[in-house]
């Protein structure tokens, strides 16, 4: 039995409102030509107004660009009232797909008490707005706050049982760890599509930030060699980082991944390069 052709999708983030949207609008117009399966729009924890950032950008992508859109909703700093209000705002603009997250903890900022975990948010959405399609986040190398992967996968099963129709992974650089994670999910009875999160490394500063914020991510020897060899050669590091991401994607598609979710960092040129190198592998038909 043949597997369905995998999807290629993109993640973008809303810019700081003080900067304006001109740059991201131009990037998204360029990305539209690549016919992504969907685009997800992130949301900042307790920093910017979700309606003026995430909802507004999701509205533009869904309605002006006619690309299916998923809005991120990190709820640890939101009340039930604010989540209900955000769902209504999204409903008004026709965005009915949510990536439900707990969200990162911000030092010295007290979380709200309504949603301790993503599962709490998923259950609330299913109760308040059952017509929304919910995507969950997952971590092939374990959630940073989880004591072990067994407990992490048990919690992931709770997310799926609560109403997630698919999953998107944290970025990773070691495909073997992703495949091992997939196998463990199958054994745990998790049978929804898992989209692999891929982020091309384009410069040294990006790599250093990533290593600082994602300490749970394993760096294969081949990846470390790229960082070491081209540490002082920005052009070569960018080329090698893109090539590494393409190699990951080709391998993932060969192994029947459900989809690849590209963390674009709002860079249309990155999306274009990846698309040009891999577009024949993907089906760009929207699920609608």
What annotation goes with each model-predicted range?
Residues 35-57, 104-113, 165-178, 264-267:
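Glycine-rich, proline-tolerant flexible connector loops at the mouths of alpha/beta enzymes
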Residues 19, 113, 117-139, 187-247, ...:
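Active-site pocket-lining/capping segments in soluble small-molecule metabolic enzymes
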Residues 11, 39, 90, 159, ...:
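Conserved, mostly hydrophobic/aromatic
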Residues 2-41:
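Conserved N-terminal beta1-alpha1 strand-loop-helix module at the mouth
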